[in-house]
Structure formats: structure tokens, C-alpha cells
Amino acid sequence: IQPNHPDSVKLRFNWNAALAQDPFSDCGLYFGTQFVHYTTDCGNNWKIISPDLTTNDSLKQKQGSSGGLTFDVTGAENYTTIICISPSPHDSKVLWVGTDDGNVQLTKDGGKTWNNVGQKIKGQPKNGWVPQIEVSPHNAGEAFVVMNNYRQNDWKPYVFHTTDFGAKW
């Protein structure tokens, strides 16, 4: 995958970095750092289509000493990164994003604006891990969000459901 990203923008990567195929383009790919990156030419050229979608909590980051990886027991990044990207199969402008610090972000205009719909989820664990968002193949505004909170020794599973693009859960 090329070209190299400009050094002026520091990126945060996760061992479980998000990668998703655009269902409307054979060569369209999404990739997650703290930003959503998008290519229309199978990875030859990339553009950033989002702001930082994480909490960007600097207390959880060790970029200066890790080269972009936040330390955990393994030395891998596990805070303030995107770990899930789920494009809608209904509309090419709709994209759901989950982060490793509890955000569930949604764009309905191809990345021009973003809404942290996760803030509306009652009962979610604070700073939970959002490894999966499953968009309904039948209903445009419907999605299931999976969260976990094992980093806080909370082993309960969390699954949330919306039918209206995250307005209610």
C-alpha cells in the first residue's frame, strides 16, 4: 500500500486496525488509525475523510516513546484508535466507526460531518472497546453495536441495537 503518509500528521495504529471493503467500489477500501482513510484505487492513493474520531485522550497515549503505539501489557496500541469500520450496504455515504475508547461515530454524508451516536447509548461501559458494528442488510438505519470492557475487569458482553441511525438505542 502506498504512498507513505506525510510525516506532519502523527498516526495511531492498533494491532486490530480496522479495514473494510467499500460495498459500492471494487477498489474502494477504508482503513482506520485515529482517522478514517479511504482509497478509490486499491491502495495507491489515500485520503483522510474524518477528523480524529477517538477521545484523543493524551493520558492514554505514549506516541513519543512508542512510535505511535500506546503501551499495554503486550506493547500494542489499545486506546484512541479506530478498530471497526462498517460501511452501509444501502448508501455509499453512510459509514459507522467504532473505537477502542468507546466512541461509535456515524457519517451520513461520506465523511463531511460525523456524529458520536455512542454518547446516546445508555448502559454502555465508559471507554469500552467497540470491535464490531453490524449494519442491517435490510434496513438502512438499523445496526447492532458490540462492546466489551475487559480492560476494566468487566467480563460482561454488551450488545446495543438501533433502528434510526443511533438516535435511540
Task: Kindly give the residue locations of the regions a language model identified.
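Beta-propeller blade termini and top-face loops
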Residues: 1-169
